[in-house]
Structure formats: C-alpha cells, structure tokens
Regions:
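Hydrophobic HxD+1 residue recognition
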Residues: 158
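Alpha-helix N-cap and loop-to-helix initiation/capping positions
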Residues: 71-74, 132-136
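Conserved alphaE helix
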Residues: 136-144
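N-terminal presequences and immediately downstream first alpha-helices
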Residues: 1-21, 28
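Conserved ATP-binding subdomain of kinase catalytic cores across diverse folds
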Residues: 17-122, 146, 150-151, 155
Length: 174
C-alpha cells in the first residue's frame, strides 16, 4: 500500500497509523457523508482535534486497473496534488492531507483521498432544485470560475458536488 502524507500532518501518529491501515478501518469506522459510485466518510482524529474526510474511489474496471497502475496517476493522487496547487494559487479548498493507493497483484484496487473537513456546503442541492439559481450566487460562481480560468485552472469535472461554498450574510457567497 502506498501512503503519501502532507508534511504538515506527518507528525500526527494517530493519523499515520489510521492511514496505514485504511483498507480495513475505512468501512468499520467513521460517518458516511456520501455513498454512491464513490464513498465519502468523516473520521474523528483525536490528536488533530478535528475530523478528516476521506473519499474512497470506486474500484477501477480491469483495463483501468492497468492504466492507473502503470500509465496514469490515480484519481486520489490527482485530487491531492490538485488541491495543493489550488491552495498555492490562493483558491480556497479543503487542505489535502494524504492519498492512499491499495494494490492487489500489482494492480490498482482502491485509492483514497484525505482532506480536512470543512463547514462549506456543496453547491449540488442548489443546482438541482426546480427554481432558478439565486442571482448573487450565480454571479459569485461566475466570478469564481473566471478566477480559476485567469489562474490557468480548467475545471475538468464541473458539477455541483465538486464546488463548495459558504454564505456570508444574505447575498455574499464565497
């Protein structure tokens, strides 16, 4: 199993032990936040004093297992490094903590991405509702996407579940 941990978290022994045994602990502990193609769970890490959110990506199909094992970075690795890059560019995103890759017979089995838990909300419920998007929210979203583009970021998976926001007052969205 490959475990890559952000330098800021390497001294947290509880977290390191947890991540190194993630393949067995993931299903036994934590609180489910989302369960669909991928699973997202929240885990209390006492030593950190806060929760860590871990996304477990679905098991790749046979051909994908070969591709992710030898030719392409895993989704978890890309999420980790993309998150670090966003922070470096001043774009608010949950702090990446680690990624874990689990292989079987040398081929990718599962991969996990860990980040700090945030109080920001998913944009998805607002997009899926039957009424038009609030004008202030729509403008804030447009400004955010322009900011991403200006900084050289092309969001390749632009869906509401991948965009987090928080509201500051009645009309200020971030």
């Amino acid at each position: 199993m490959k475990v890559v941990i952000n330098d800021e978290y390497k001294n947290c022994k509880e977290l390191v032990v947890f991540l190194e045994s993630l393949d067995t602990r993931y299903r036994q502990k934590g609180r489910t936040l989302h369960l669909d193609r991928n699973a997202v769970r929240s885990f209390a890490i006492t030593e950190l004093g806060r929760d860590v959110v871990i996304k477990r990506y679905k098991k790749p199909l046979s051909v994908q297992r070969v591709v992710y094992s030898f030719f392409r970075k895993s989704k978890a690795e890309r999420a980790y490094y993309n998150g670090l890059k966003l922070l470096e560019l001043g774009i608010d995103t949950p702090t990446p903590i680690a990624y874990v890759e689990q292989k079987k017979a040398g081929l990718m089995e599962y991969c996990y991405f860990a980040c700090e838990k945030t109080t920001h909300k998913s944009l998805e419920p607002l997009i899926l509702q039957d009424k038009p998007l609030d004008d202030h929210l729509a403008m804030s979203l447009a400004r955010f996407l322009i900011d991403l583009h200006t900084k050289g970021i092309l969001h390749n998976d632009l869906n509401g579940g991948n965009i987090l926001y928080y509201q500051d007052g009645d009309t200020n969205y971030h």
